[in-house]
Amino acid sequence: YFEEDVLYCPMIDARRMEVYSAVYDNALNDVVPVGAYVIDEHTFSDLLDNRRIVFAGNGSTKCKDVIKHRNAIFVEGIVPLATDMLALGERAFRNGQFEDVAYFEPFYLKEFIATTPKNKIL
């Protein structure tokens, strides 16, 4: 799905009404930074009032019934692939953005919180 002046919002299902997401323009520039967002009827409404946003990913499924804005477009069946990272990788390469693999640390959106399972099976 490609149109001028449309924003793109990939979503990964977190838990409850939370998603890991960001919003990008056609050139893949950050409009809203990567983060963990709790979804309600006002999520991204400031952007939706002015532009259409295409929502995709397994997190968008649960948002479809909550975000009812006329500019919200939900696309199903998009499966993320490594080839989808090509444009971002090429841009980083052209800009000389390389990671020092000896000191690189993964980017975690949230701290891990261990919980004890409620049903203990022996």
List where the protein language model places each region:
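Acyltransferase
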Residues: 75-122
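Surface "functional belts" at beta-alpha junctions
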Residues: 1-80, 108, 113-114
